Every structure is written in structure tokens, then in C-alpha cells.
Amino acid sequence: MKILFVDCCISQRGKASRTEKLCRTFLRSVRAEHVDLKNLELKPFTAEMLDRRDGLFRSGAFGDEIDALARQCRDADGIVVGAPFWDLSFPAQLRIYIEHISANGVTYYYDAQGPHGNCKARWLLYLTSGGDFARDGSLGTEYWKQLCAMYGIPEFRSVFAGGLDAMPEQADAFMKEACGKAGALAAELLNTADFPD
């Protein structure tokens, strides 16, 4: 079982990051391949980068560094994404990562019927926390849900620890509840009997 952890747990709190605590709760019983976006220093795609990647796609020459993150995402059995709830969605580093993994011919492909997913993952779990409370149609959550459909990942789950700054006197209780949900999802999603060797 190959689990990919996309870590965008950017916080002034450092190791006291609330989103990171959610992620640690879920991941404590499994080894995951860790992509730390805080240290990766990805750059947004430029026209030149797109031309290069499109050229590789046309020639079928995948394996270049430019699509390495996309191949890593495509090959995972399960994906965990951790990011704080910022400005109604998530930090810019995560959006730039999405540009790098959304590679035609790697994580998805087109034919006459439209786009089709190419990812092996059975599920993607989005873990997030924020000072405010959850709203219906949260942009970050909806974005990942749509990406799962595009990448062919059949199951999307999310846990949001919200209200942590709006009601600081209840923040510990809110975190405990969210960590409980993350732990329950770990027991369900990380059942190794469901994954091939």
C-alpha cells in the first residue's frame, strides 16, 4: 500500500499546527511518502514549462523531472492532503502543486468522450482546519472533490476542524472531535486487506 501525504501544513504555530495534528492523527499507523510543500519551493507554471510538458506528452516521453510529482500522485494507492483553511480555500503553495500534478497523459487524459482519470488511488482525504466555521460549498473542499473526479479517484473524504479562533474556549473540544473523525477514517481507509501488495 503506497500512501502519499501532501503536506501543506503552513502555520506560524510550527509543530503546534492544528492541521498538522489532524494529519499526524490519521497517519500515525502507516508509513507515507511525504511531499513537504513548505520546503519544495515549486514555481507556478510558465508558458515555457507548459510547452515543455506538452512536448513530452506529444512524444510519449514521460519520466522527466517536470512530471515527477504527477507520476508520484498517479501511482499512489491513497492520498492525504493537509492544508489550512486560508482565504476561503488553501495556501498558494498547494495550488501550485496542483499545477504540477495536473498533467495530461499522467494523472488524466483526454479522448473524444472527454477527460478520464489515470490515478490508481482508491481515495483522497483532505484534512484542514481554520479559525472560522465550515460553510457549505467550501472552495478548497469542492476543488479537491472536482480534482478527484478528473483524476479518476472514486472516493473523496474530508475533515475540517473549524471554529478554532471564532470560539477559542472550545478549540480543544473542536480539535478533539476532528481528530476523532480522522482516526476513524484511518481505521476505515487504511485497511490493508483492501489494497494489493
Predicted feature locations:
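Short, glycine-/small-residue-rich phosphate/pyrophosphate-handling segment
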Residues: 110-153
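Cofactor-binding loop segments of dinucleotide-utilizing enzymes, especially the Rossmann-like FAD-
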Residues: 8, 37, 127-130, 161
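Short secondary-structure transition/capping segments
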Residues: 72-88, 128, 153-170
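Short histidine/acidic/glycine/proline-rich micro-motifs that form metal-
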Residues: 9-14, 130-134, 165
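Conserved nucleotide-sugar donor-interacting segment of glycosyltransferase catalytic cores
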Residues: 101-113
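Glycine-rich phosphate/pyrophosphate-binding loop and the adjoining helix
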Residues: 135, 141-197
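N-terminal beta1-alpha1-beta2 submodule of the flavodoxin-like/Rossmannoid cofactor-binding fold
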Residues: 1-99, 103, 180-197
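Hydrophobic/aromatic residues located in beta-strands of well-ordered beta-sheets
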Residues: 3, 32, 123-124, 156
